[in-house]
């Protein structure tokens, strides 16, 4: 059988369940139930419940929307029991437990974080969740950290960091999601003790003020280096996925004038290539929405594990559009399909730790990076795309 997986999840949010939450039922952050969930495969003829006949089978590892081919037979209970299955691009897993473990397509090479060919260092600076425009009680600290970041990018002599000599080797800056803090709850938190809530006009004014600060920040750094600005669900520009680039009308004349040369308003997910040595390296990046939604409907809690599954499924978010709002597209190409394996796959996260792993798929080395939350850690990542190495930059500021 060949079709798409469908996972029935009774804990999936619904209008009536949302009413229960309003009436006092505790809200949940994940909707997976190992006992109640059911796994199906569906095609044009209908939907068939399935189960795996091998010891390592776990239905919680599957989500809806995965292209799948299975081999097996239907038992007397009407369940299709499969012992072999295939994902996109001829990735097989065998019913035998030993073969199942040995046939894992993800091989972690014994490579460390060192230069491979002593090439000239060329860096991309990844900044995730910079969240310009914190609530007032955190504004001073946020501005101070941002000032240190600007000084680092401008390679000012007065910045006290061992990494200042790397600034002139940065070829591109990528702001990966949540560049603007537009979360209403952030503004609510500062006055929650007053049992009051800011009006929509106050929130809109705060968002507008934050856009002005973002404009000033971009104006400072775009005079020095190329910037790619990725949108996210928190920028309130386009809540449908994949997200189009931010509207130019959101930016001042100074920034828009620079935009034609060094400020690139890009999409989310973001696919691009950059020249490395005598070849081009292919990058795929997301602002993390696909990772977050897959976490809610699967057993995976680690961003890197989900990123591996994205590559295995050859899709950034198979679960869309059922659980992640997806805009309709009239051509035959799925915009979230991974048609070519990347050299680097990166994503934004709300996590404190930076996670980095090198894997090999189909004899190709792929680097996975789950970026640290800059607003929580004041950390960003310098990735040397010539030598496949990285450095973590941390800005410390004491009031």
Language model segments and positions:
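Extended recognition/assembly regions associated with phosphoester-bond processing machinery
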Residues: 1-399
